[in-house]
Amino acid sequence: MTYKLYIMTFQNAHFGSGTLDSSKLTFSADRIFSALVLESLKMGKLDAFLAEANQDKFTLTDAFPFQFGPFLPKPIGYPKHDQIDQSVDVKEVRRQAKLSKKLQFLALENVDDYLNGELFENEEHAVIDTVTKNQPHKDGNLYQVATTRFSNDTSLYVIANESDLLNELMSSLQYSGLGGKRSSGFGRFELDIQNIPLELSDRLTKNHSDKVMSLTTALPVDADLEEAMEDGHYLLTKSSGFAFSHATNENYRKQDLYKFASGSTFSKTFEGQIVDVRPLDFPHAVLNYAKPLFFKLEV
C-alpha cells in the first residue's frame, strides 16, 4: 500500500461551517469524499470509485496545512498534566493554557515535543475575508460570503493510498473545485502529488495496539465504539446538511451523524465505516466517509 500526499494549493475558498458568513481553514475527509463521488459520477466511474472506497486498504484523511512540510492536528488530551512544568507561576500557567487552547495544528517535527510538554504558538496559515456579493432580481440582493485566503507559502494536503483512479479524480477535481460558492470562482486548486516524508510514513497505521491519534474525522463500527469512548480523549463533531434530489428538484435534510474529530487520541486503533445518511425515503444512498488513518503517538 502506497500512501501519498495530495497537496492542494488554493487561492480562495469557502469551507463552510453552517453559514455563508463564516469559513474554516480546512475541511474533513467526508467533504472531499463527497466531492470525489460527484466527480466520479460526472466521469461515469461511480461504481468503480465506490468499489475502491469500500476496500479495507482505501484511506483518506482530513485536510491539514502544508507549509514547508506537513502539519498535523493538535493531539487532544496532551500534554498530560504531569508533563507540564509545575514550578512556573500562575500567570505563566494561564499564558500556557491560552497558547494550548489557540493551537490548532503542529508542524510534524514539533509533535513529539508537544506530547512531552513543550508548548508552541499557533501558526497563521490563512486569513478569513468577508466578500459582499450581489444577487440581481432578488429582494435583499446583497449578501456576505466569508472566504479563506491562504498565505503564499501555505497549501492543504490529504493523505490517501494512491491509485490510478484516485489520481484521475483528484486531477479533475482541481478544476471543479472544493467547498462552497464554486460558481463564484472559489475552491479551485493546483494539485501536487508527493511522497510522504519517512518520519511521517513510519508512524501511519490502521492497526496498532498502543496510543494513536486519528487523522480523519471518524466513527468506529459498533463493536469498537464503546472501548474508543471509554479510553479516548476526543471532541465530537456533528455532520449534517442537505441532499438534493433530481427526482423532486428539492433539498432534503440528511440524517445527523456525530463523529470523533481529527486530533482525537485513543489507546489503540479502531475500524471505521462509511455511513449512509440519506433522508427518509430518499431515492439513493448519501454516503458519509468516516474510516480513519492513525498516527502513532510515541510518549
From Swiss-Prot:
Task performed by this protein: CRISPR (clustered regularly interspaced short palindromic repeat) is an adaptive immune system that provides protection against mobile genetic elements (viruses, transposable elements and conjugative plasmids). CRISPR clusters contain spacers, sequences complementary to antecedent mobile elements, and target invading nucleic acids. CRISPR clusters are transcribed and processed into CRISPR RNA (crRNA).
Family: Belongs to the CRISPR-associated Csm4 family.
Keywords: Antiviral defense, RNA-binding
Name of the protein described by the UniProt record: CRISPR system Cms protein Csm4
Regions annotated as coiled coil: none
Signal peptide segment: none
Further details from the record: Encoded in a type III-A CRISPR locus.
GO biological process, one term: defense response to virus
Domain of life: Bacteria
